[in-house]
Curated annotation (Swiss-Prot):
UniProt keyword Magnesium present: yes
Gene3D superfamilies: Photosystem II protein D1-like (1.20.85.10)
Similarity comment: family membership: Belongs to the reaction center PufL/M/PsbA/D family.
UniProt keyword terms in alphabetical order: Chlorophyll, Chromophore, Electron transport, Iron, Magnesium, Membrane, Metal-binding, Oxidoreductase, Photosynthesis, Photosystem II, Thylakoid, Transmembrane, Transmembrane helix, Transport
Lineage: Bacteria, Bacillati, Cyanobacteriota, Cyanophyceae, Synechococcales
Entry EC no(s): 1.10.3.9
Protein name: Photosystem II D2 protein
Alphabetical list of PANTHER family matching this protein: PHOTOSYSTEM II D2 PROTEIN, PHOTOSYSTEM II PROTEIN D1
Length: 352
């Protein structure tokens, strides 16, 4: 007698069917993360293109900010809402716009729309890297690295204005608008002297330096295994052997510096660690600015410079420049406040 042993058929529910469809092999992978990424990225980019094409910033900042008004690619922006709206999300159906699309554009409703969809789109992209890493069986360091840009975006566009009085003080989504925000951070927070900014600069420039050194060193030590003027075509993605000599690279840098990386895994972890840590540190600094925390204040130099007209340092010159930026920028940047500074309070000194 033959006994057949087998599993009872398992019923597949709608979740399993959807899971199979989302993870199907296609030119552009969708996945569960795609349910967040693609709609949010589409909305954020579409909102930005709409705003920069024909939406004015006259009612929020007193500025022209669209192609329709004569701005160009470097000066268009989706600008932040007016200061009076505080931290309202300015929903189209909310009490401010009341379902009126034109009014929603005028009061700056596109800014929170782009900011929030952009933030969730970036998070969706990081989840996409996690998901694909898991499916192909590799570690998720790409997603971990991408947490750096997400931290910067969230801290600059969301955390900073949340710590201030309104979304008005967030950067507008445009090249010149972000330049204005950088000048604002310097004038009102002395951002360049902040140690977290210094760590961010060290991380980004250090990462660029490591990238350049690594690329040049690999190019220097490629095996001459091709007949062409360059060795690019001699490489096969599936080849088992190395395409460059780590031993030669190690010997070269040992002669240059006296020390060199001898472990590829440690080398590449270091290239990951430096820029990502820089991004995270600068994000921490921005959250500090949101709370109006001060960094370095060399009060002794300021007091001596005030008493002794012959004593001045680069620090005291920068403090004067910051005072000038605040005095002349605030009336332009915040016209709704009607700032009027009498002549005697405007900074004077060798720096200006």
């Amino acid at each position: 007698m033959t006994i057949a042993v087998g599993r009872a058929p398992v019923e597949r529910g709608w979740f399993d069917v959807l899971d199979d469809w989302l993870k199907r092999d296609r030119f552009v992978f969708i996945g569960w993360s795609g349910l967040l990424l693609f709609p949010c990225a589409f909305m954020a980019l579409g909102g930005w293109l709409t705003g920069t094409t024909f939406v004015t910033s006259w009612y929020t900042h007193g500025l022209a900010s669209s192609y329709l008004e004569g701005a160009n690619f470097l000066t268009v922006a989706v600008s932040s809402p007016a200061d009076a709206f505080g931290h309202s999300l300015l929903f189209l159906w909310g009490p401010e716009a009341q379902g009126n699309l034109t009014r929603w554009f005028q009061i700056g409703g596109l800014w929170p729309f782009v900011a929030l969809h952009g933030a969730f789109g970036l998070i969706g992209f990081m989840l996409r890297q996690f998901e694909i890493s898991r499916l192909v069986g590799i570690r998720p360091y790409n997603a971990i690295a991408f947490s750096g840009p997400i931290a910067v975006f969230v801290s600059v566009f969301l955390m900073y204005p949340l710590g201030q009085s309104s979304w008005f003080f967030a950067p507008s989504f445009g090249v010149a608008g972000i330049f204005r925000f950088i000048l604002f951070l310097q004038g009102f927070h002395n951002w360049t002297l902040n140690p977290f900014h210094m760590m961010g600069v060290a991380g980004i420039l250090g990462g660029a330096l490591l990238c350049a050194i690594h690329g040049a060193t690999v190019e220097n030590t490629l095996f001459e295994d091709g007949e062409d003027s360059n060795t690019f075509r001699a490489f096969e993605p599936t080849q088992a052997e190395e395409t460059y000599s780590m031993v030669t690279a190690n010997r070269f840098w040992s002669q240059i510096f006296g020390i060199a990386f001898s472990n590829k895994r440690w080398l590449h972890f270091f290239m990951l660690f430096v820029p990502v840590t820089g991004l995270w540190m600068s994000s921490v600094g921005i959250v500090g600015l949101a709370l109006n925390l001060r960094a370095y204040d060399f009060v002794s130099q300021e007091l001596r410079a005030a008493e002794d007209p012959e004593f001045e340092t680069f620090y005291t010159k920068n403090i004067l420049l910051n005072e000038g930026m605040r005095a002349w920028m605030a009336p332009q940047d915040q016209p709704h406040e009607n700032f009027i500074f009498p002549e005697e309070v405007l900074p004077r000194g060798n720096a200006l």
